From Swiss-Prot:
One of its GO terms (cellular component) is membrane. Stable up to 40 degrees Celsius. Substrate binds at E180, G316, A317, M318, E319, N320. This is Puromycin-sensitive aminopeptidase. The modification 3'-nitrotyrosine is found at Y464. It is found in: Cytoplasm, Cytosol; Nucleus. Binds 1 zinc ion per subunit. The record marks Y438 as: Transition state stabilizer.
Length: 919
């Protein structure tokens, strides 16, 4: 499953200028932080809810399932005939079941009479039902029959309804599914655990003018005997698979199709009249399937793959085997009206979901503890795939900004969790669909791939997929296969990364010894609140690469740091050469250099001799060290000014994100405008070089960079940018000159931030007129930029209106919270005032966690952590408990950062104003 893109986390941190701060200072800061955490009850997660997995005495062999959805009254009828194996004599069968009413149930042992169930005991809290029988079911096989009814809900989970508008303007509904993690039980009674696999024979009774899809190809379509307006559609039997991967869709769709070079039928289903918008995803999918087949050396196991755009969809996409569901914005590309970033996103999401067809579907995690095996791996290999299809995207540099740093932000918190985390109750499972399972998982796999090399990695992946195909596996099984392929101690190394939370800070200092360079390395757990405080500091086995200015793109030495401290000698390094750790920013750690080593690296930023991904990593480490209180934020601002010649989009993107975090922090002060002046000074030179219009020879990354820079300058109030944005917006609205898709977001943001009620009304009109969901989302994401209190309230009210799809409400409210200090307060009040409606809308899924995170994490006053905690104590959100803890911790970290550095930042900005620096 691909989670929809979140706004950048407000939690960045790390590196070092000058000698380390006195340990006592760090200790005092850390202890005071942790005292505040403990006083608020935020230092540890609450006790886990009681949970038991299903008993093993009865298990399915095959589900024969027929569903008849009613698209007018939003109900469905179901008939299940499950071939089952009774492994231990029993008089009851326990299954998962939620929001379903069972009408009748019976069990017929093979060759014997049917036994009717005499009772259905629903355990609603545990989402289970116990079927009781009057006599003992003996060991052996038999058939379990259940007739049931359910509701096509509007919660975007289970078997639910999705609203769409026909080309003629009529509102209609499709019936669609979203079962991961634990919602197949809302469509039919089942053994809803990933390790309880079976085959499926699915039939759908649907209106004859509707499209019906499921995991497999259609094998029969015939009139339904009881109603001439209905047809019964039967699908081929699936391979052995987990319940969470079952899917069905009933609605009105067009499609485009092709065949991959391996002969697999590939279709992209789109809303009626928009088949053209499916062609880009179709092209990507047709390239991706053979790429994965060759990489894994395992063929795609189904005869077809459908990719379909769903109007109301909570996640970004879902990898159902053979029928992958997507948000419209994650699948559809309009050749004229889609921006470059949307094309890239579609390519990544398609690559992610198709990777799951092997890694997750063919071989499935044994339990949700190993979710990261699915999501971490897919989140890594999607980049490998896109790099293969679109090498011009420089996608691996973007990985560092999008995934690697995002994971480190979260994993530095006291309220993080290990990659492998014990989960039980469904509410706990929802919680781990986060940046640890996805982005940290992807980052440590990237590190592992680099450590053992591509050849042995591919060999190990083939061994793993071949051995466990159509079965389940745990993390240890993957390590064993990779260890056998590479001969390296994979389990010993990787257990330090997956079984304990956090990551190390590597401190390094250097000494020239004749013609060699002696490096002294030490590792300690990096903490967002400063130094680690505890009896036994965790240790990692860290693959470390070291490069020098002699050849910045090649590792001079690779080592495995398997102890707290070690010395390394680099042969033949001249005194004037710099030395850098973590070539390519591949190792999942932060680096803190001695002042002399760091000073030697800074010219490499100015003259671009450091590779882009290393410039990015160096800056990001510094910023994170400042957030943690290890260095002064002023030192980071000085380094940021060295990026005046920077040409790389992703480096600018990371700089922009960090300056955005700092701007949010300083919005709590009375010198917010001074940091905006700094932003304008840093971004003006690159803005002038780029201009507003594409130049001959420019490509994908230039388009991304132009939009980023103009948006940053416009938001900061850069006069020339603001004037040009207003001119182009006026021409766009009047139809004189339509804005290119790549310029719309920065222009919309700029005119709204510095506009009035008329500007907002025009934006809302553009939203209403937009035929394309990408354009609607583009507008929704910038509405929060408006500054006037009455307009902020208007945007918040709009967020819950019928004009905004349920899954997009979160980004509108989050945009308000991130737009200004007043917006943050207004958004928090709005959430509290409308909590019942919002919580019911998302039913405790991951969108509620996203909403909470985006809305409160930008606060920087200690008392707000207490207020947030108190609100959720009286308004429980079980699936967001960890997110709430993390948000409160971040609020305290922001407050500490502000108290510590605000005055020095202010003085530095005033000093710059008095005598602008020359760079």
């Amino acid at each position: 499953m691909w989670l929809a893109a979140a706004a950048p986390s407000l939690a960045r941190r790390l590196l070092f200028l000058g000698p380390p701060p006195p340990p006592l200072l760090l200790l005092v800061f850390s202890r005071s932080s942790r005292r505040r955490l403990h006083s608020l009850g935020l230092a540890a997660m609450p006790e886990k809810r009681p949970f038991e997995r299903l008993p093993a005495d009865v298990s399915p062999i095959n589900y024969s399932l027929c569903l008849k959805p009613d698209l007018l009254d939003f109900t469905f009828e179901g008939k299940l005939e499950a071939a089952a194996q009774v492994r231990q004599a029993t008089n009851q069968i326990v299954m998962n079941c939620a929001d379903i009413d069972i009408i009748t149930a019976s069990y017929a042992p093979e060759g014997d009479e049917e036994i009717h169930a005499t009772g259905f005991n629903y355990q609603n809290e545990d989402e289970k039902v116990t079927l009781s029988f009057p006599s003992t079911l003996q060991t052996g096989t038999g058939t379990l029959k259940i007739d049931f009814v359910g509701e096509l809900n509007d919660k975007m989970k289970g078997f639910y309804r999705s609203k769409y508008t026909t080309p003629s303007g009529e509102v209609r509904y499709a019936a669609v599914t979203q079962f991961e993690a634990t919602d197949a039980r809302r469509a039919f009674p089942c053994w809803d655990e990933p390790a309880i696999k079976a085959t499926f024979d699915i039939s759908l009774v649907v209106p004859k003018d509707r499209v019906a899809l499921s995991n497999m190809n259609v094998i029969d379509r015939k009139p339904y005997p009881d109603d001439e307006n209905l047809v019964e559609v039967k699908f081929a039997r699936t391979p052995v698979m987990s319940t969470y991967l079952v899917a069905f869709v009933v609605g009105e769709y067009d499609f485009v199709e092709t065949r991959s070079k391996d002969g697999v039928c590939v279709r992209v289903y789109t809303p009626v009249g928009k088949a053209e918008q499916g062609k880009f995803a179709l092209e990507v999918a047709a390239k991706t399937l053979p790429f994965y087949k060759d990489y894994f050396n395992v063929p795609y196991p189904l005869p077809k793959i459908d990719l379909i755009a769903i109007a109301d969809f909570a996640a970004g996409a879902m990898e159902n085997w053979g029928l992958v569901t997507y948000r419209e914005t994650a699948l559809l590309i309009d050749p004229k009206n889609s921006c470059s970033s949307s094309r890239q996103w579609v390519a990544l999401v398609v690559g992610h979901e198709l990777a799951h067809q092997w890694f997750g579907n063919l071989v499935t995690m044994e339990w949700w503890t190993h979710l990261w095996l699915n999501e971490g791996f897919a989140s890594w290999i999607e980049y490998l795939c896109v790099d293969h299809c679109f090498p011009e995207y420089d996608i691996w540099t973007q990985f560092v900004s999008a995934d690697y740093t995002r994971a480190q932000e979260l994993d530095a918190l006291d309220n993080s969790h290990p990659i492998e985390v014990s989960v039980g109750h469904p509410s706990e499972v929802d919680e781990i669909f986060d940046a640890i399972s996805y982005s940290k998982g992807a980052s440590v796999i990237r590190m592992l791939h680099d450590y053992i090399g591509d050849k042995d990695f591919k060999k190990g992946m083939n061994m793993y997929l071949t051995k466990f195909q159509q079965k389940n596996a745990a993390t240890e099984d993957l390590w064993e296969s990779l260890e056998n392929a590479s001969g390296k101690p994979i389990a010993a190394v990787m257990n330090t990364w997956t079984k304990q939370m956090g990551f190390p800070l590597i401190y390094v200092e250097a000494e020239q010894v004749e013609d060699d360079r002696l490096l002294r390395l030490s590792q300690k757990k990096f903490c967002a609140g400063g130094s680690y405080v505890g009896e036994d500091c965790p240790q990692w086995m860290v693959p470390i690469t070291i490069s020098t200015s002699e050849d910045p793109n090649q590792a001079k030495l690779k080592i495995l740091m398997d102890k707290p401290e070690m010395n390394v000698v680099l042969k033949n390094v001249k005194p004037d050469q710099w030395v850098k750790l973590n070539l390519g920013t591949v190792g999942f750690y932060r680096t803190q250099y001695s002042s002399a080593m760091l000073e030697s690296l800074l010219p490499g930023i100015r003259d671009l001799s450091l590779p882009p991904v290393d410039r990015l990593g160096l800056q990001n480490d510094l910023f994170s060290l400042a957030r943690a209180g290890i260095i002064s934020t002023v030192e980071v601002l000085k380094v940021m000014e060295a990026f005046v010649n920077e040409p790389n989009y992703t480096v600018w993107s990371d700089l922009s994100c960090n300056l955005g975090i700092l701007s949010t922090l300083l919005s709590h002060t009375d010198f917010y405008e001074e940091i905006q002046e700094f932003v304008k000074d840093v971004f003006s030179p690159i803005g002038e070089r780029l201009g507003w219009d594409p130049k001959p020879g420019e490509g994908h990354l230039d388009a991304l960079l132009r939009g980023l820079v103009l948006g940053k300058l416009g938001k900061a109030g850069h006069k020339a940018t603001l004037e040009e944005a207003r001119r182009r917006f006026k021409d766009h609205v009047e139809g004189k000159q339509i804005l290119s898709a790549d310029l719309r977001s920065p222009v919309y943001l700029t005119v709204l931030k510095h506009g009035d009620g008329t500007t907002l009304d025009i934006m809302l009109k553009l939203h209403k007129q937009a035929d394309m969901q990408e354009e609607k989302n583009r507008i929704e994401r910038v509405l929060g930029a408006t500054l006037l209190p009455d307009l902020i309230q208007k945007v918040l009210t709009f967020a819950l209106s019928e004009e905004v799809r349920p899954q997009d409400t979160v980004s509108v409210i989050g945009g308000v919270a991130g737009g200004s200090k007043h917006g943050r307060k207004a958004a928090w009040k709005f959430i509290k005032d409308n909590w019942e409606e919002l919580y019911n809308r998302y039913q405790g899924g991951f969108l509620i966690s996203r909403l909470i995170k985006l809305s409160v994490e930008g606060f920087a006053v200690d008392k707000m952590a207490g207020e947030v905690k108190a609100f959720f104590e009286s308004h429980p959100a079980p699936s967001a408990e960890r997110t709430i803890q993390q948000c409160c911790e971040n609020i305290l970290l922001n407050a500490a950062w502000l108290k510590r550095d605000a005055e020095s930042i202010h003085q530095y900005l005033l000093q710059r104003k008095a005598s602008p620096p020359t760079v």
